[in-house]
Amino acid sequence: MILKHQSIKQYVQKHMLSDILKHIELCARTSYKSEDKFDTNKSSSLFVENMIKSGHTSVLEHGTVYLTVLSDRKEIINFYSTNPYSTVMNDGLLTYITTNYRVIEENKRYGDLMSYMSAPTKHIKRFTFLITTDRGTSHEIVRHRSMSFTQESTRYCNYSNNRFNNNVTYIIPEWSNVPEGKYNIYSSNVPWLNTTESCFYDGLIDNESDYFGLLNIGWTTEQAR
Protein backbone atom coordinates (compact mmCIF):
# COMPACT_ATOMS: atom_id res chain seq x y z
CA MET A 1 0.00 0.00 0.00
CA ILE A 2 1.24 3.50 -0.86
CA LEU A 3 0.01 6.70 0.79
CA LYS A 4 0.31 10.02 -1.04
CA HIS A 5 -0.70 13.61 -0.43
CA GLN A 6 -2.99 15.37 -2.88
CA SER A 7 -1.13 17.34 -5.54
CA ILE A 8 -1.57 19.25 -8.78
CA LYS A 9 0.77 19.98 -11.67
CA GLN A 10 0.36 21.34 -15.16
CA TYR A 11 0.85 19.32 -18.34
CA VAL A 12 2.16 21.81 -20.92
CA GLN A 13 1.21 21.20 -24.55
CA LYS A 14 2.90 22.81 -27.57
CA HIS A 15 0.82 23.73 -30.62
CA MET A 16 2.06 21.53 -33.49
CA LEU A 17 0.04 18.44 -34.53
CA SER A 18 2.68 16.04 -33.24
CA ASP A 19 2.61 17.86 -29.90
CA ILE A 20 -1.19 17.68 -29.74
CA LEU A 21 -1.15 13.92 -30.32
CA LYS A 22 1.66 13.44 -27.81
CA HIS A 23 -0.34 15.39 -25.22
CA ILE A 24 -3.42 13.24 -25.87
CA GLU A 25 -1.39 10.06 -25.42
CA LEU A 26 0.04 11.31 -22.12
CA CYS A 27 -3.46 12.08 -20.82
CA ALA A 28 -4.77 8.71 -22.00
CA ARG A 29 -1.90 6.81 -20.42
CA THR A 30 -2.58 8.65 -17.18
CA SER A 31 -6.11 7.24 -17.34
CA TYR A 32 -4.84 3.75 -18.22
CA LYS A 33 -2.04 4.07 -15.62
CA SER A 34 0.53 3.12 -18.25
CA GLU A 35 2.66 6.27 -18.01
CA ASP A 36 5.74 4.03 -17.90
CA LYS A 37 5.11 3.22 -21.59
CA PHE A 38 4.98 6.88 -22.64
CA ASP A 39 7.90 7.57 -25.00
CA THR A 40 8.58 11.22 -25.79
CA ASN A 41 10.76 10.19 -28.74
CA LYS A 42 8.07 8.08 -30.42
CA SER A 43 5.19 9.31 -32.58
CA SER A 44 1.78 9.18 -30.94
CA SER A 45 -0.18 8.94 -34.20
CA LEU A 46 -0.83 5.19 -34.05
CA PHE A 47 -1.74 5.31 -30.36
CA VAL A 48 -4.33 8.04 -30.92
CA GLU A 49 -5.64 6.31 -34.05
CA ASN A 50 -6.20 3.07 -32.11
CA MET A 51 -7.86 5.00 -29.29
CA ILE A 52 -10.30 6.55 -31.76
CA LYS A 53 -11.07 3.11 -33.22
CA SER A 54 -11.83 1.80 -29.72
CA GLY A 55 -14.31 4.63 -29.16
CA HIS A 56 -12.39 6.28 -26.31
CA THR A 57 -12.71 9.75 -27.82
CA SER A 58 -13.30 11.76 -24.64
CA VAL A 59 -9.54 11.97 -24.06
CA LEU A 60 -9.17 13.77 -27.41
CA GLU A 61 -10.63 16.82 -25.69
CA HIS A 62 -7.32 17.33 -23.89
CA GLY A 63 -5.61 18.09 -27.21
CA THR A 64 -5.92 21.85 -27.64
CA VAL A 65 -6.04 23.18 -31.21
CA TYR A 66 -5.41 26.84 -32.06
CA LEU A 67 -6.50 28.12 -35.48
CA THR A 68 -5.94 31.56 -37.01
CA VAL A 69 -8.00 32.52 -40.09
CA LEU A 70 -8.81 35.63 -42.07
CA SER A 71 -12.05 37.15 -40.84
CA ASP A 72 -13.68 36.73 -44.27
CA ARG A 73 -13.65 32.90 -43.93
CA LYS A 74 -17.30 32.86 -42.91
CA GLU A 75 -17.97 29.10 -43.15
CA ILE A 76 -15.10 28.24 -40.82
CA ILE A 77 -15.90 31.03 -38.38
CA ASN A 78 -19.61 30.18 -38.32
CA PHE A 79 -18.88 26.51 -37.62
CA TYR A 80 -16.68 27.17 -34.60
CA SER A 81 -18.82 30.06 -33.37
CA THR A 82 -21.77 27.68 -33.04
CA ASN A 83 -19.72 24.81 -31.64
CA PRO A 84 -20.18 24.65 -27.83
CA TYR A 85 -16.64 23.33 -27.29
CA SER A 86 -14.86 26.10 -29.22
CA THR A 87 -14.24 29.79 -28.62
CA VAL A 88 -13.75 32.50 -31.24
CA MET A 89 -12.01 35.87 -30.88
CA ASN A 90 -11.85 38.56 -33.59
CA ASP A 91 -9.62 41.62 -33.92
CA GLY A 92 -10.91 42.76 -37.30
CA LEU A 93 -8.52 41.30 -39.86
CA LEU A 94 -7.96 37.95 -38.14
CA THR A 95 -10.12 35.52 -36.19
CA TYR A 96 -8.60 33.36 -33.45
CA ILE A 97 -10.23 29.99 -32.80
CA THR A 98 -9.59 27.74 -29.81
CA THR A 99 -10.97 24.22 -30.05
CA ASN A 100 -9.93 20.65 -29.27
CA TYR A 101 -8.96 17.56 -31.22
CA ARG A 102 -12.25 15.79 -30.53
CA VAL A 103 -14.12 18.55 -32.37
CA ILE A 104 -11.71 18.15 -35.30
CA GLU A 105 -12.04 14.35 -35.37
CA GLU A 106 -15.80 14.01 -34.92
CA ASN A 107 -16.55 16.69 -37.52
CA LYS A 108 -13.75 15.63 -39.88
CA ARG A 109 -12.30 19.16 -39.96
CA TYR A 110 -8.76 17.99 -40.70
CA GLY A 111 -8.45 20.56 -43.48
CA ASP A 112 -8.78 23.33 -40.90
CA LEU A 113 -6.04 21.71 -38.87
CA MET A 114 -3.66 21.48 -41.80
CA SER A 115 -4.34 24.97 -43.17
CA TYR A 116 -4.91 27.20 -40.15
CA MET A 117 -3.18 25.64 -37.14
CA SER A 118 -1.06 28.22 -35.32
CA ALA A 119 0.66 29.07 -32.07
CA PRO A 120 -1.64 30.76 -29.54
CA THR A 121 -1.50 34.55 -29.73
CA LYS A 122 -4.80 36.32 -29.08
CA HIS A 123 -6.60 33.01 -28.62
CA ILE A 124 -8.46 31.97 -25.50
CA LYS A 125 -5.96 29.55 -23.97
CA ARG A 126 -6.70 26.12 -22.51
CA PHE A 127 -4.68 24.29 -19.86
CA THR A 128 -4.32 20.69 -18.68
CA PHE A 129 -3.63 19.82 -15.05
CA LEU A 130 -2.83 16.47 -13.44
CA ILE A 131 -4.70 16.35 -10.13
CA THR A 132 -3.76 13.56 -7.74
CA THR A 133 -6.65 13.14 -5.33
CA ASP A 134 -9.15 10.56 -4.11
CA ARG A 135 -12.05 9.51 -6.29
CA GLY A 136 -14.64 11.06 -3.99
CA THR A 137 -13.10 14.49 -4.49
CA SER A 138 -12.67 13.98 -8.23
CA HIS A 139 -16.36 13.17 -8.62
CA GLU A 140 -17.20 16.55 -7.12
CA ILE A 141 -14.90 18.25 -9.65
CA VAL A 142 -16.21 16.49 -12.76
CA ARG A 143 -19.72 17.78 -12.17
CA HIS A 144 -18.46 20.97 -13.84
CA ARG A 145 -18.60 19.72 -17.44
CA SER A 146 -17.45 23.01 -18.97
CA MET A 147 -13.99 21.48 -18.59
CA SER A 148 -12.65 18.13 -19.88
CA PHE A 149 -11.71 15.40 -17.44
CA THR A 150 -9.95 12.06 -17.76
CA GLN A 151 -9.64 9.85 -14.69
CA GLU A 152 -7.66 6.76 -13.85
CA SER A 153 -9.73 3.99 -15.37
CA THR A 154 -11.40 1.46 -13.08
CA ARG A 155 -11.77 -0.83 -16.09
CA TYR A 156 -8.21 -0.84 -17.43
CA CYS A 157 -6.04 -0.34 -14.33
CA ASN A 158 -5.07 -3.59 -12.63
CA TYR A 159 -2.84 -3.28 -9.59
CA SER A 160 -2.09 -7.01 -9.44
CA ASN A 161 0.10 -9.24 -11.65
CA ASN A 162 3.22 -7.59 -10.18
CA ARG A 163 2.26 -4.22 -11.67
CA PHE A 164 3.06 -1.20 -9.47
CA ASN A 165 4.77 -3.67 -7.09
CA ASN A 166 1.33 -4.97 -6.10
CA ASN A 167 0.54 -1.77 -4.22
CA VAL A 168 -2.69 0.20 -4.36
CA THR A 169 -2.17 3.95 -3.92
CA TYR A 170 -4.44 5.84 -1.53
CA ILE A 171 -4.74 9.58 -0.97
CA ILE A 172 -4.09 10.99 2.49
CA PRO A 173 -6.99 13.19 3.64
CA GLU A 174 -6.12 16.81 4.38
CA TRP A 175 -7.24 16.35 7.99
CA SER A 176 -4.80 13.47 8.57
CA ASN A 177 -1.20 13.69 9.77
CA VAL A 178 -0.24 10.33 8.29
CA PRO A 179 3.10 10.71 6.44
CA GLU A 180 3.55 9.61 2.84
CA GLY A 181 5.20 6.25 2.29
CA LYS A 182 4.84 2.57 1.47
CA TYR A 183 3.16 0.43 4.10
CA ASN A 184 1.84 -3.07 4.64
CA ILE A 185 0.47 -5.13 7.49
CA TYR A 186 4.02 -5.89 8.67
CA SER A 187 5.28 -2.29 8.54
CA SER A 188 7.28 -1.12 11.53
CA ASN A 189 7.36 2.53 10.40
CA VAL A 190 3.81 3.26 11.49
CA PRO A 191 4.00 5.91 14.23
CA TRP A 192 0.24 6.28 14.63
CA LEU A 193 -0.73 2.66 15.39
CA ASN A 194 -1.89 3.58 18.88
CA THR A 195 -3.60 6.80 17.83
CA THR A 196 -6.92 7.73 16.26
CA GLU A 197 -5.27 7.25 12.83
CA SER A 198 -5.09 3.49 13.38
CA CYS A 199 -8.67 2.88 12.19
CA PHE A 200 -7.92 4.74 8.97
CA TYR A 201 -4.74 2.73 8.43
CA ASP A 202 -6.37 -0.62 9.25
CA GLY A 203 -9.27 0.15 6.90
CA LEU A 204 -6.92 0.78 3.99
CA ILE A 205 -4.96 -2.40 4.68
CA ASP A 206 -8.21 -4.40 4.70
CA ASN A 207 -9.42 -2.63 1.56
CA GLU A 208 -6.23 -3.41 -0.34
CA SER A 209 -6.33 -7.04 0.79
CA ASP A 210 -9.96 -7.40 -0.30
CA TYR A 211 -9.17 -5.86 -3.70
CA PHE A 212 -6.44 -8.39 -4.45
CA GLY A 213 -8.57 -11.20 -3.06
CA LEU A 214 -11.44 -10.38 -5.42
CA LEU A 215 -9.06 -10.29 -8.39
CA ASN A 216 -7.66 -13.68 -7.39
CA ILE A 217 -11.12 -15.29 -7.47
CA GLY A 218 -11.84 -13.95 -10.95
CA TRP A 219 -13.49 -10.59 -10.49
CA THR A 220 -12.75 -7.99 -13.15
CA THR A 221 -10.68 -4.93 -12.27
CA GLU A 222 -13.79 -2.76 -12.51
CA GLN A 223 -15.75 -5.00 -10.14
CA ALA A 224 -12.90 -5.21 -7.64
CA ARG A 225 -12.38 -1.44 -7.56
What annotation goes with each model-predicted range?
Residues 1-225:
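Family-specific signature for flavin-dependent thymidylate synthase
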